[in-house]
A protein has these predicted regions:
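Short aromatic-glycine-(Arg/Gly/Cys) micro-motifs in beta-strand/loop hairpins
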Residues: 3-20
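A detector of low-complexity, intrinsically disordered, Ser/Thr/Gly/Pro/Ala-rich segments
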Residues: 19-22, 62
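A short, exposed loop/beta-hairpin motif centered on an aromatic-Gly-Thr core
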Residues: 21-31
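Short, charged, surface-exposed hinge/linker loops at domain edges
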Residues: 1-3, 35-71
Length: 71
């Protein structure tokens, strides 16, 4: 299964997240965050309803953008 995962840094931790399912995990390194994410996603998948799994398969993000907003 292929899904879109974003990784960003929050303080000293890396955060990996799937915006479609809401599954999120973190780690001290990018690799650790992704490893933890895979474990969290597998646990989510075991408990997810069929319609949630179908949405996850169809829900590839179109783009991830970095915006510089003046607020």
């Amino acid at each position: 299964m292929k899904i879109g995962v974003t990784v960003h840094k929050e303080g000293k931790l890396y955060v990996a997240a799937d915006p479609v399912t809401g599954v999120t995990s973190q780690g001290k390194t990018c690799d650790q965050a992704l490893k933890n994410f895979q474990e969290a996603f597998e646990l989510w998948y075991e408990c997810a309803e069929d319609w949630e799994k179908e949405r996850a398969l169809k829900g590839e993000p179109v783009a991830t953008l970095v915006l510089d907003l003046n607020v």
